[in-house]
Amino acid sequence: MASRSLGGLSGIRGGGGGGGKKSLSARNAAVERRNLITVCRFSVKTLIDRSCFETIDDSSPEFNNFAAILEQILSHRLKGQVTWFGYESPRSFWDYIRVACRKVSQNCICSIENMENVSSSRAKGRAWIRVALMEKHLSEYISTALRDFKTTRRFYEDGAIVLGEEANMLAGMLLGLNAIDFSFCLKGEGLDGSFPAVIDYTPYLKYIQGSDSISSDEEELRTLGSSGSESSTPENVGPPFLMDENSWFNKCKRVKQKYQLTLEQKGYLEELLRLRENQLSESVSQNKILLQRIEDSDLAHKLEKEQLEYIIVELQDQLTVLKNNDLRSRQELTAHLTNQWPSPGALDVNAVALDTLLYRKHNKQWYEKSYQSLDQLSAEVSLSQTSLDPGQSQEGDGKQDTLNVMSEGKEDTPSLLGLCGSLTSVASYKSLTSLKSNDYLASPTTEMTSPGLTPS
């Protein structure tokens, strides 16, 4: 019984010891996370305060401390890289950032990968912090990486800051750095990745005297100084207070410089505002003038359009009237011609077209002259032949007689007849048609019997 009770007691003690180690480890991890997040918040505040007085660059101690803090946060409980032999080699947070921040639009991952003077992963991670601050996208990078929870779980162990609730606080704190203009040299000594980053906690440590304390801070410092060495006197405590006074004087001087700078900026902005107001007033006046011109142009265009529409309507009316007059004139002309000229059946058989007779008379005279000239020519030819060959004179006389007979009996074909009559009259056209239909004009009797003759 005693042995069993001792065994059970030892088991209970062993279990309690294991639980104590776990709780202690959890407490240490929580304290570590809280310390890093708190000091990061202080570092961001000091950076913002420092940026009001001077430009933040690689030589600024506030930035160097902030970069070390951020590097410690991103490296907190980072898993090692497993080799082929099963060993874990140390890994930099750049390996995680390179994978998790690929989705950021216009990211600088490829640019940092291609940098010639940066070779190690730690140096590339430090270069990424500087570039992200200059681009004012550090908060966006961290937020995008934290949203990729699967990748984050693959790179970090349980209890890491990026896997806890402190991660959201980290992204919110870094958002305030977007208001600061950073200027870094990516070829400096700060990118050396051979040494790990070390955090300086002294700027953020301040002793707060408790309410139960009896002595003041000065008396306690004097007592501690006298107990530490006999040579310590109250006079030796003076320099810190003088340093405080100097620090206040320096702060006052910086505030004065900041006030002067702000005053100059205020004057510049007022002058710029005055210039912009003048430009705005000129633009407004020009806009009014242009609007008035546009209104006048619209009015003129409307009036011109109305006038053109009125002219179009008037021209259409005139065209309609002209068309009606033309139609009426055609009808009157048709009626007049119909009433003036009788039908072909009503024409007198003895009626002869005057213009046809005149044409026949003119052609007859022309034919007579032509025949006379031909007779003379044939007579001369016959005389010449008779003189040359008397025996052939008789034969030539016979040919001459035959030629005369043919000329007398020749008919007038339509191809030799010109146009007769006037084409402006319907009756003349009818007379010409009758002439063509008869093919020849044999005698006046035939001409008078044609149906299309014009009255004399």
UniProtKB/Swiss-Prot annotation:
Residues 8-21 have a biased composition (Gly residues). Residues 224-235, 382-405 have a biased composition (Polar residues). Residues 57-189 form the RUN domain. Residues 1-24, 216-237, 382-411 are annotated as: Disordered. The modification Omega-N-methylarginine is found at residue 13. InterPro entries: Run_dom (IPR004012), Run_dom_sf (IPR037213), RUN_RUNDC3B (IPR047339), RUNDC3A_B (IPR047340). PROSITE patterns: RUN. Gene3D superfamilies: 1.20.58.900. Residues 300-325 form a coiled coil. The keyword Phosphoprotein applies. Keywords: Coiled coil, Methylation, Phosphoprotein. The modification Phosphoserine is found at residues 215-216. It comes from the Eukaryota. Interacts with RAP2A. Belongs to the RUNDC3 family. This is RUN domain-containing protein 3B. The lineage of its organism: Eukaryota, Metazoa, Chordata, Craniata, Vertebrata. The gene is RUNDC3B.
